[in-house]
From Swiss-Prot:
MF terms in GO: identical protein binding
Record's comment describing the protein's domains: Two central helices mediate homodimerization through parallel packing.
Keywords (A to Z) from UniProt: Apoptosis, Developmental protein, Differentiation
InterPro entries in alphabetical order: GADD45, Ribosomal_eL30-like_sf, Ribosomal_eL8/eL30/eS12/Gad45
Family: Belongs to the GADD45 family.
PANTHER family on file: GROWTH ARREST AND DNA DAMAGE-INDUCIBLE PROTEIN GADD45 (PTHR10411), GROWTH ARREST AND DNA DAMAGE-INDUCIBLE PROTEIN GADD45 GAMMA (PTHR10411:SF4)
Function: Involved in the regulation of growth and apoptosis. Mediates activation of stress-responsive MTK1/MEKK4 MAPKKK.
Region of interest (Homodimerization), residue spans: 43-86
Protein name: Growth arrest and DNA damage-inducible protein GADD45 gamma
Amino acid sequence: MTLEEVRGQDTVPESTARMQGAGKALHELLLSAHGQGCLTAGVYESAKVLNVDPDNVTFCVLAADEEDEGDIALQIHFTLIQAFCCENDIDIVRVGDVQRLAAIVGADEEGGAPGDLHCILISNPNEDTWKDPALEKLSLFCEESRSFNDWVPSITLPE
């Protein structure tokens, strides 16, 4: 029996529970940040915010469905955003269900369909006291994932 097999046997239930907890925390964080007006959605809009004020960004969500995996331009943007987030100590996760993300975040300002949700940044509001428990859970999840060399962990959002 190898170390990987031993480690894999011990962590499967723990890993599933950890992933479900992270998905629930992400759901709560998105709802809270959306209510506070702290979301920036869209690859290009997010790149602008990261370029202008990276210190104000606390969390990044990259989302791609299976059909998006073949989009080379999107994957290049993801790589650049990931590098920027890692360099600026911004926690980052991937989500594989853009439609579920759209259901959580909702429609855009005009009341129409949601725009580009492939990248969502969560920023600090102007209030210094904003401490979201879901953000703290996700930060811990990302830190634990990095200790396993998983720099951009994937999260499944709850139904």
